[in-house]
Structure formats: structure tokens, C-alpha cells
Amino acid sequence: MKDLMTSYSFTEKKRIRKDFGKHRSILKVPFLLAIQVDSYRAFLQGDVESSQRKDIGLHAALKSVFPIVSYSGNAALEYVGYKLGEPMFDERECRQRGMSYGAPLRVTVRLVIYDRESSTKAVKYIKEQEVYLGEIPLMTENGTFIVNGTERVIVSQLHRSPGVFFDHDRGKTHSSGKLLYSARIIPCRGSWLDFEFDPKDALFTRIDRRRKLPVSILLRALGYSNEEILGEFFEINTFHINPDKGVQLELVPERLRGEILSFNLTDGGGVIVEAGKRITARHVKQLEASGISALAVPDEYLIGRILSHDVIDATTGELLASANSEVNEDRIVAFRKAGIDSVGTLWVNDLDRGAYLSNTLRIDPTRTQLEAQVEIYRMMRPGEPPTKEAAQNLFHNLFFTFDRYDLSMVGRMKFNRRVGRKEVAGEPVLYDKKYFSDRNDEESRRLVSKLGETSDILDVIKGLCEIRNGRGVVDDIDHLGNRRVRSVGEMAENVFRVGLVRVERAVKERLSMAESEGLTPQELINAKPVAAAIKEFFGSSQLSQFMDQNNPLSEVTHKRRLSALGPGGLTRERAGFEVRDVHLSHYGCLCTIETPEGPNIGLINSLAVFARTNQYGFLETPYRKVVEGRVTDEVEYLSAIEENQYVIAQANTLTDDNGQLTESFVPCRFQGESLLKPPSYVHYMDVSPMQTVSVAAALVPFLEHDDANRALMGANMQRQAVPTLRAQKPLVGTGIERTVARDSGVTVNARRGGVIDQVDAGRIVVKVNESEIIGATDAGVDIYGLIKYTRSNQNTCINQRPLVNVGDIVTSGDVLADGPSTDIGELALGQNMLIAFMPWNGYNFEDSILLSERVVEEDRYTTIHIEELTCIARDTKLGSEEISADIPNVSEQALNRLDESGVVYIGAEVRAGDILVGKVTPKGESQLTPEEKLLRAIFGEKASDVKDSSLRVPPGMDGTVIDVQVFTRDGIEKDKRAHQIEEYEIKRVKKDFDDQFRILEGAIYARLRSQIVGKVVNSGVDIKKGEVITGAYLDGLKKSDWFALRMKDEVAVEAIDRAQKQIQAYQKEFDQRFSDKRSKITQGDDLAPGVLKMVKVFLAVKRCIQPGDKMAGRHGNKGVVSNVVPVEDMPFMEDGTPVDIVLNPLGVPSRMNIGQILEVHLGWAAKGLGHRIQRMLEANAAIADLRKFLNEIYNHDKSVVGERVDLSQFSDDELLNMAKNLTDGVPMASPVFDGASEQEIKRMLDLAELPTGGQTQLYDGHTGEPFDRKTTVGYMHYLKLNHLVDDKMHARSTGPYSLVTQQPLGGKAQFGGQRFGEMEVWALEAYGAAYTLQEMLTVKSDDVQGRNQMYKNIVDGDHQMVAGMPESFNVLVKEIRSLAINIELEDN
């Protein structure tokens, strides 16, 4: 979408998509890999000065573990800073050598030893040193990690946010169906604390899901007495006891509501409530109005109430009644006798003031703080004898020290918000005013002065009681406000911290030695645990996944994936329907369409196009601010929690030119409900119609016309498209193709603007604009190396090809080279095919696809796959294996593709079974027969000591060898082939560096020339003083003599000196880089233990489309190719054009993916417009006419914002160039939920001079007769998926057998047989094919003697079968014997 103001870049001028979007794009699609790249950048903070680093990532992990203090406290190891070194090998070398791409981490630590003798902490000595802490993996520019030579992605995890959550059991625990409420405090690390009600309304607590204890034990362990507990949780009613009889209640009218009194309630004048009637809210109001402050009640009214305090006889000090005991008649008598004038009771009722804590205190066996702490100790450590210190320390370490407990910034924010506090910041530990004010250490005093009167645990229990009392609501755990994203950086930080904690334990032990023995920090710290933790995480964590590299889209989608699985997450089996379902809060944050089918459905999600994570890790999505019914261009990001309070309108709401909402009622969302509101009520508006979907779903045109299930399949299947030989842009796209291709990193984009200086298949050189050159050392030349024929993770081919010519002027960001599945910088996953919807002789039954032979002929769906085959020579017990061309018992012909080192040469075309690398393995000495001994003695034959174990081409594969790599262990002599490869590689690198240097040197001389030509000379070679320098003079001069020139002009002299310094600096840098590369190439390789030599052979396999391959459109319309039909038999149009693909029309109505029909219509129009442009070009039409026609296509409808294309910016040549690119079809963009309407499609068909109905008359290819009725014909972007028949087809005659059952193995990978199962056996039984059945069950399966005999018989030419005993019967007999039942077979 372009406004008239913006100018078009070099790439955009080549081809412009006609956009049908009605809405102006307010916000550019953000960088799609930001969630990965930003997260890891923040973790490393590699480009930030040590002193400026924020408290996150590596820095935070190191700070949290250090300083490490020895047990005696006399030695400490402090953290100063860290720095990342340079990676040893670059990305390409790591991929090639199977290494991990990372940089060494060096941490500066300071060892401080204190003087033992001194009373104050006097420092004895300090030692500061850099310590190596292992390799930290580095992320590539494209958001991946290279681990052991393969690209991996760390998928972000969606997990339950730390904080406090209130929930209930949905009535499932107790038979009565009563809702049992619970609360849970979840920290980032540390023990979980649960509170839960039982069916009798007592409140219990659990720590780490262990056995439950009454909650009062926890409160008592914090230091609260019974009275304090009751005071915290209940309001108190005060009764004044009259000396003779009767009681006065201090009246709070509200507290009487709902009670039934046994006496008349009067206000001095009249009766307000009669005895036996319930007091209602109306009565309460009357009482408040009457202003009565005290109420005389009979003694019976006090009986059964619960005392809030201990009642003590003031004279004797005797305890008359303890807090939480009930008042009875005897106690009232005792109170009067002791002269107690007032008592407090708890205000409780069954309606909304439950006596929960009072009930709980009655079942609490403990009386003192220590008893309670001991009880908790017993529960946490059953079987260990508790001591006072142990119990106190364990309790303190559970929730109150940062070493063991961390709520984290997020957890504290969520906690404070949920318990209703204003401030969101706070301490990472749980705080309790009573507990910390009773302790008397420095940390406790700091916390008390900072946090004062708050108490976390009390607040949670109060909140839970409020919910149980009917005030307050439970949390929705599936709401995105309660689930947060853990990205790479955070996970890496946690793993790093775990490694450091392991190191800490070891260092503490050694620190006590350091005091006496004077060890250095390097000797104290062993980096292995850190390195091991990191290696394990990146190598084998559930969230570290082998990157899906089928095509650029699959890469981008994989990096934007959010998984609820993984460590600390859910498991497939336990996840219920609610977690997987689409939630209201997903809007704009998670894609509502794209998720896998199968067991992971809903657990793995994709990030929506505009979504991002905020500082706390919650997903947020952008909205445009609406002020008084007018939409502004101000964009604000709101998280799921924040957007709950606003009314938000949809992106396609109608507005006038000033942004005023024009509808009287606007469709909006508010608190998860869809409603209609007047414009003045609207707070925000969506930024884009495609806000709710992910990148893959946003690539499906007319998505709004597809059923959601099919849209899901369409989005998922685009990720499986194999890059075709020549990518072809989709005629009908959505306008986001360019963004995806750019952000995926498969294309080469200009870093800076300039002029193309050189181009070849492997390199592009750009001479940078003067204005963009930075610094004196910058030569102003950018060199881009292209990737050629490289294997991807999925064995598809990655290849880049240049798009520019010498002399082209490019700006920053322009596409210089296309990668796989991209066409002029746009994502192009498939091919645009001419499609007809009609049945054809049953060949498109059940979603089958009928293809024309022309498709195969033109290589439209031909793909290249690169297979890597490896041969390893190991050191065995019997001797070492050897790679050589000297292999026993192999014909000359089988070896004719190998060189003298036994390795296949590059360019060889090989078939299944051909030897690629000759290898022999020593075999054990076998007993020789006398004849063999004699032959040995005569001929000295020793070759039979080795057996052939060569690398052969696997069955079902053929191709061309495109590359061979030989890796040799250090200290083992390299063979001739290894030397050849090494020499070639060094030559290539040398040429590369020489070229780069020559280009840079040329650029420097060219710039210098422009600065000194025309200047007057003072001195120089072959020139007199006072002469003027000319271009001809410089051409005749040796380049090195330029630097001897001296002028009057100081600036020119400076330019000469600067150029000389630049060239010398580059020379030095290139020499250094070349020697580094050379030493890397010549040094031995780091191979696995026991491996002497490894040879990798790369085969390029060309796969044409054939019956059995799976294909699909973008709307979930998938099928399998059933037949490839000669062109002459295909249905053809009036002008003789045969169709490419025939699809079954019955695949559309029941599937409800109508989007494909609209795509076909619009695609036909796009192609037709291309034909019209081609006809104009062939007729040499005037440029003005061409301009007018293009204007007619692009700028017809002024109301459509996305359509305006400013053709006046194009020169005639540029216009002609673009027109040539459009002859194949004018690409269209129909954005998701904002696409082309039926009228617009008809208009386009009309403009293309095609029938507006979208149907045309087809003729039968066999007979040439017209079909009975017109057919829907048009162009659809169709994909070939990575489910190829060649990879699945498999057959075996003989092969490996299972050890136990002696039946053939199963599966292609094991070269197994076809399973002849139960139903197949029944089929043969039904046919009465007894001999065939016997053969199947014996000699073809597991009758060992029978199959050996069969082989002998066939060799002897005797085709008889003798079936014996199947091995599986013997297995059955053994199993029965294991049950102590003996079975013996009797000879019959």
C-alpha cells in the first residue's frame, strides 16, 4: 500500500502489486523475528559497556549468584563484569564442520581475603582475574542457533505467569458438588504455597503440594497469636455485661442484617422488627436513621457467640475463657462474678461472614510459634528429628530469602495487582509485617522500613475468604493476562543461573582452602557445570528444535511459534479442552487459525502479525487511539489485562476523510463481548484487519471466505511447500509477501545505497554513496557473498541468484538477490497454474489431482533436493578401518567412479547401490580349511582379512555428486583427495580475498583520483613543480607512485595520506584474515572419539512431479496427483490453450473454502491483463497509451486507499521495464479481511476482456467436442508439498530381521518389509489360498530353516517350498513357560 507521497524503491519499480485494500496502513508490519532477536540481544548485552549494563540476562544471573562467601566468612569471590570474545569459526565454517557457533565468555572476578585476626573486617589481599566460563552460543542474524552444525530454533514458551491465582474445583472434589475455593502463590523459583477450603469450611495450606496443614499453623509460624489472627480476619462486636442481668450491644446496624431476633427490636418509640422476623436492608436503614448506638439484648443473645480475646479475671489473673471459645451460660455467670464489664465477639453469619479461620483454629494442635515451625519442618522433612535452629531456618528459607525464593518482577506486579495494591514494584520474597518486625537482622530491618504494614500471606487469605463469602471472583487461568511468554533470552538466563549455582557449591568448598593456600580465582572456578547446562539446553531441551527449513515461511513461522509444552509447562496428556481452545484474550496476540492438527492442537500457537511482548513478558497488540469519535494516527500497545477496560472498534469501521467515525452504531468489543456502541463511547480501534492472524494465515488471499478448519490446513500446508526450480510470484497475494521474504533473511538486501559495481553468480559488489560512508577507514564498498546450492535442514536446496545488473542504482533495503522460494523479493511458494473445476474420467475422484504433461515438461514443479551421505572410518579393536579404492571382491566397473583415494569424484551421476566411498573393515581371524591354507602358502593371499563396508547410494535414490568433504583427525596423514580439496579451498579463499582487496583498492584509488585531478603539484614522480595533475598523467603512473605526489592544497595531501593508510590497513587486515583461514583449513579436524576420518558426499537429486506426490492450494484444498496426461488429451479453451490442472468441483461445497474460487477468478483476470499488456508491447504501442492502461488497472477506484499508484514517478524506460515484468500477469493483493469484492473482480475480468462470469467453454481433448456446459477456469497459486512419493515408496526382497521374533523389520528407514496383518490373513483365508497363506506365515516371515532351505532350493533350480516351525511359535512357547506351564511338542 503506497500513498502518492512516497517514492518507489528500485525493487518496487520492477513490479507493483495492485492492492484492493480499503484501509490505509497506519503501522508497518514489525520485524517478524523481533521476539527471538531482541530477547537474545537483551540476554547477551554484548554491545553494551560493562558499567552501562541493565539488570537482565547474563549480567543479572551473575549478579544473583555472586558474591560467593566462604563458610567462615573470611573469603569472598565478587563479580566485576564480563565480556564476550570473538567466535572461533564463522557461521559457514560451523555448519560445514559440524560445530556450534558461539563465543567464549570471560568473566572478571575479584577474590577478597579478609584478615582473620582483625576484629573489624579488614581486607588482607585482593586478586582480580579473568575466568573463562565456557562458550555462549551466538544467535545468527536470522534468529537461529547453530548447534553441532545444524540450525536450531529455541521456541518461546507460553506458561502460567508467577503471582497469585484464585480458583475453585468446579464442584468435582466433594460428592455434594459444593465449590471448594483455593488460592495459589506461584513464584518464579521456589516453593509453591497453596490455600484451600475443605468441605467443612476449614482453611488449609499446602507447601509444594505436600500434605495439608491447617492454615493457622502457617500464621502461627509467622508469629501470630490466636487473638491476633482473629483480629486480622474478623470484625468485633462489643457486648457490655450488666451486673445483674441483660447485656448491652454496641450497635452497628449493618451487622444485624439477615438475623432473626427472639425479641422485638424497638427504636424507643415503635417496634422496627417484631420478634421472629428476619432483619432486612430496609430495617437496617431505619435503624441507621434512628441513631441508636446501643441495644439492650437478653443473655441468650450472647450464648453461642465466639470470643475474640482471652477473658481474664483482673484480680486473680485466672483465664476465664480463651479467644475463639464459645460463650455459654456458665461463662456469663463467671464473667459477672469476676466483674468483667465488656467482652468482644466475632461478627460471623452463614450468609456472607463465614467463621472459617475460627473453625480452622479449633483443629490446630499447635500453641506456640516454635511448635508451628516444627510442625512445618515435620511435613517438609518427614523422618528427620527437628531442632529449633533447623525448624526456624527451614521455615525462613521457604519463602523469605532471595536465594531460595523469587517471585520475580512479573510475579510481584501480578501479586500486588491481584490483592488490590496500588504500587506494582516490590520485593521478590514474600513479606509479612509481624514476622520481619520480630526478627532483628539487618535485612529484616530494611524490609520493615521499606514495606511497613503490608503482609502478603494475610492479604491472600483475606482475598480467598472474601471470594468464599461471595465477594470477588476467581481467575480465568486461560486468559492471556495470566499466561506470559518466556523467550530465548529468559530461558537461557535461567539455565545459566542453574549452572552457576552448581559452580557456587564447588567454589564455597574451595574458598576455605583459598584462605590458607592462596589460590587464584581461575583455580577456584570450574566452568564445566555452566558449559554443560548451556550445552544441554541448546542441544536437547524440548524447546530447542531442529529448524523447519522447507521454505522461508516455515522458518519465520517456526521462530514465531509459542508452545505451552516444555519444562515448566503443560503435557499433551494432561492438557484439557479449555487450555487448547481459542480465548477472547487471544485477539490480536495469538493467531486464532494457525495451530497444528493432532495431539498438539491449541498447545502450540503462532504469534499474531502485530503482536509483541512487553517488559513483563505478556503479549500486547497495537490499537489506534480514538478521541471523541475521531480516529487518530497515535498507536498504543495494550496487553490483554489493559484492553479489558476499553471499548475497541474493528479495523474496517467506516470513517470519513478526517477520521471521524461515520456509523451511528459502531461494532465493538468490550470485556470480551461484541456490541454496538455510539462513536463517542469508543476508546480505541484496531490498526489493521489482519491483526488477529499470524503470518502464514495472512498469506492466504480471501481468507474471510474460507471455513476456519480449511484455513488452518491452508496456513499449515504453506509451510510444507518445497521451493521449486524457478520461483513464481503468486498472481493473487495479500500484500505481505515482500515483508515475509525480507524478514526471513533468505534474500540479500542492500545494507547501504549505491551503484552496482560488479555482479556474478556468487558475489555482488556495491559502490556505496559518498553520503553513506562512515569514518576514515571505510572504503565505501559493500561486498555480498551469495549462498550457492546448499542443503537445508529438510534436504531442500538453498540457492541465491542476483537480480541486479552492473550500473543499477540501489538504495538501502533493496533486494539484490533472490533466495529459495522468492521472486523479485516476494515470497513465492508455488506456481500459478491454469485450473479447471470439472470431473475428468474419474481421475480426480476424492481430491485427486489431474496434471498436464506440459507441467512436467516445463519443469514447473521440479525441485532439487540435496542429500548428505556420510562415511566414517573408525578405529576398531581388530585394527583401523581404511578408506581406499582397493576393495575385495568388487568389480572394476563398480569402482570406476572413485579416485585413487577411494572417494567418488564431483559430477559423477550415481544410482542406488553405487559405491560413493570405498571402505574396508578388518574382520576377525577365521579358521581356515586346509585347502585355503595351501592357497595362502602358495600365493601369499591376505586380502580376505578385510570385509567391504563401503558407503553406497541408498535404495531408491539417484543423483549427481555436487560436493565432497574429507575430514581427517589431527595427527593422521591426509590422503591425496583431502590435499586436493584443501588446495582448492585455499585457492578459492585467496582469490576471494584478492578480489575483495582489488575492489576496495580500486574504489580508494577512484575516489582519490577525483580528489587530486586538477590540483597543482609541488613534487612527484615524472612531473614538474607547478604542473597540474591530469587523468592521463595518473593513468601512466604506477599506483604506488601516487602517494609520492605533494600539492599546495593541504586537503589533497591529506586525501593522499588517508588513502595510503586505508590501503595499508586493508592489506594488513586481509593478510591476517587469509592466514587465519588458511590455518583453519590446513589444521586437523576435531572429530568424535575413535573416528579417524570422515567423508561427506552431497548428492543433488532432481525430482519431477509424478503420480503420488501431494499438492495443495492455499485454502486447505489438498490432494494427491493421480495421473499425468498428455497435453493433447487435456480439456482446452476456445483459443486452444490447454488447462494445466483439473480439480474436482465436489471438493469445494462441503469443505466451504470458497476463497479458492475467488482466487481462481481474480487470477484469471490478472493473467488476462498481462496478456493485454503483452499485446500492446508487441504492437509497439505508445508509452502514453501504456501509461494510460496501467493507470486504468491501478488507479481506477479513488475510494480504495491501497490502490493509488503514482505512475508519474516512473520514467519511460522504467515504465517499459515494469510493463515487461507484468506480461506474465499483473500481480494483485487481496489483504485478509479487507479483500477484493465481487464487483472489483468482475471489473478486473472486464478490463482483461474475459467473461465476467468467470466461466468459459472448454473442449474435450480426446474428441475436440465442447463440453455440455461452461466450466470455471482460472489461475490458482498451487504448491507442491514435501510429501513426495519418492521418499515414501519402498520395496524389499530380503533384508534385516528382528532378533527375537525373526520377522522382517518394519519401515523404510530399517529397510523393512510390508506388514501382512490380521485382515490380510483373513482375505487369503476367504479366497481359500492355502499355499499362499502358508508361504506368507512361514518362509516369507519367520521360519528360519524354511527360508534358508528356500534359498538353497532356488539356487539349485528346484522351486519347492518346505515350511517349518515359525520362530514366533517358539517365542510363544517360551512366554508360556515363563508362566510355569510347560509345553512340549510331540512328534506325530
UniProtKB/Swiss-Prot annotation:
Question: What GO cellular component is one of the record's annotations?
Answer: DNA-directed RNA polymerase complex
InterPro entries membership: DNA-dir_RNA_pol_bsu_external_1, DNA-dir_RNA_pol_su2, DNA-dir_RNAP_su2_dom, DNA-dir_RNAP_su2_hyb_sf, RNA_pol_bsu_bac, RNA_pol_bsu_CS, RNA_pol_bsu_protrusion, RNA_pol_Rpb2_2
- Coiled coil: is it a keyword of this entry? no
One Pfam family recorded for the sequence? RNA_pol_Rpb2_1
Tell me the domain of life.
Bacteria
Q: Which reaction does it catalyse?
A: RNA(n) + a ribonucleoside 5'-triphosphate = RNA(n+1) + diphosphate
Which terms under GO biological process does the entry name? DNA-templated transcription
What GO molecular function terms would the record report? Answer: DNA binding; DNA-directed RNA polymerase activity; ribonucleoside binding
TM segment ranges: none
Q: What is its EC number?
A: 2.7.7.6
Q: Which UniProt keywords apply?
A: DNA-directed RNA polymerase, Nucleotidyltransferase, Transcription, Transferase
Among SUPFAM superfamilies, the record links this protein to: beta and beta-prime subunits of DNA dependent RNA-polymerase
Question: Tell me, how does this one assemble?
Answer: The RNAP catalytic core consists of 2 alpha, 1 beta, 1 beta' and 1 omega subunit. When a sigma factor is associated with the core the holoenzyme is formed, which can initiate transcription.
What does the record give as the function of this protein? DNA-dependent RNA polymerase catalyzes the transcription of DNA into RNA using the four ribonucleoside triphosphates as substrates.
Family in the record: Belongs to the RNA polymerase beta chain family.
- Please identify the protein, giving its name as recorded: DNA-directed RNA polymerase subunit beta
